[in-house]
Amino acid sequence: MANYQNIMRLRPEVRQFIRNRRWVHHGDVLTYGANVRCEAFSTDETGFRHSVFEGESLSLRQIILAERYGLVLGPSSVYGFGLAGNENTMSSLLAERFGFPFANVGLPEGNSRNLFSILLSIIARSPRPPSAVVHISGGDFTNFCYTSIADPVFGSPNLKQIAMALEERGGRPPPEQQIKPLLAFTSLWIRAIAQICRSTDIPLVLADDTTFFEKTDPSDIERQSELGQPFNPSQDRQFATHRRFVSDYHNRRKEVAKSLEVPLAGPGITNDIGFVDEFHYDRDGTRSLCDDFAAALEPLL
């Protein structure tokens, strides 16, 4: 993706995320490495990044035992790759805003099917259901762009399955043949999340998340980081697929949110927020998104 040598020079804290990046299978789902402790961030015993509430770092397990709690479901942008300080993540900012803890349920390229499974397990096994859910579905699309492979029920191969999936198929299929299954997949599982929230009276906000590719005017540090410039043929294909189909994905998510009568919050198809790399927000960008999410969530609480 971006020129990480430049990024680490311009943003030294990113080194901590590179050095401590670890992906672990739980069943067929990738999570982050458990019990990571470093200056920039930490994870709990199941690999979820700690959230901060009233100055205390809390694990997912601790948060779901609270009298009142929220969940932020999503991919690595929710986890906060490159964003130093657990207190600066989406979940911590929403906790600060609403006065109760939010858990950081971020997975590597976390897709809506796997996030639905986590949500269902929390509702079924916890003493109380969450008081709020924010769902960021952008991982459905960004994961697809690695391989141009999608199944309408199961989605795209995870990051550790890419080589195997491409070998099975003899290479990447044309993305225009696979975008419809991808859109069917994201529609199915966003609806599933909305339906379970509605059936249990949980306020839900869908995030209209965005990437550097939709930014209208890059900042100086983003230009110096060479964001958006591919450095190998695989990235060239990935970035081209993203640019070609991001409007299709954005429009489908908007249609689904409208049909479900669920708020869709975020900057939309274009943005002017800050990025660490093409897919991860800096501190100001994260806060800007959370302001949008909070404005949509507040009337529901």
Residue ranges and their predicted role:
Residues 1-70:
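N-terminal secretory targeting modules
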